[in-house]
């Protein structure tokens, strides 16, 4: 289980995260929604052991990941940036990653290369943005991680490919009993994928509940989000933006 307890992180005088707590259970996909700059990437970096929290604790199965190479070998953090060297091919990146991750699977690598239809000998710098995102996913899942941290995983992918990748995510998490934390600024993407949703706003977790609850009680979720943001000048604008992200079907069911 991935667990954050009262996480706070500052950069100078700026507080990026304030008292954030969440849990991602085994076999669960947790979706973290929030606008750009609210601290999503920072939280993922803390939970995956890249950053150290200023206060609070980040643990996986009760153990800290920060400065813990053994635990990091069970994790994969895919950022918005590339998970590869641009002048390398996928085959060269395979050699790079297989030397670090003990559970690396050539079988998974070959299967995903074929499934995505990318050229494993071409320099990744020649790939389109969408193909580069696919390359990152190939490398991520070939490490056979127990804990996945995906930052804006669908960036650059078309709708059809997003649907297929969602199915792949769900299949992997279910069959491997993995834990996945995926962030996005698009609520619809996460609503279709995640078992659990967390709404990060102004460095705090405004809502933390099951996707099923959010679907069935949209007004309650909106109320919770509004209460949490009652002191901000941009409440009305941000609530309108959240509404735009919600499927029209759920709007109709509100009445």
Question: Where are the language model's segments positioned?
Answer:
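ABC transporter nucleotide-binding domain
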Residues: 166-250
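Helix N-cap at the start of a conserved alpha-helix in ABC-type nucleotide-binding domains
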Residues: 159-161
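Helix-to-loop junction immediately C-terminal to a conserved catalytic motif
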Residues: 48
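The feature captures the beta-strand-to-loop junction immediately N-terminal to the Walker
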Residues: 33-35
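Catalytic Walker B motif of ABC-type/P-loop ATPase nucleotide-binding domains
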Residues: 148-152
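ABC-family P-loop ATPase nucleotide-binding domains
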Residues: 79-132
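Conserved ABC transporter NBD signature motif
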Residues: 56-71
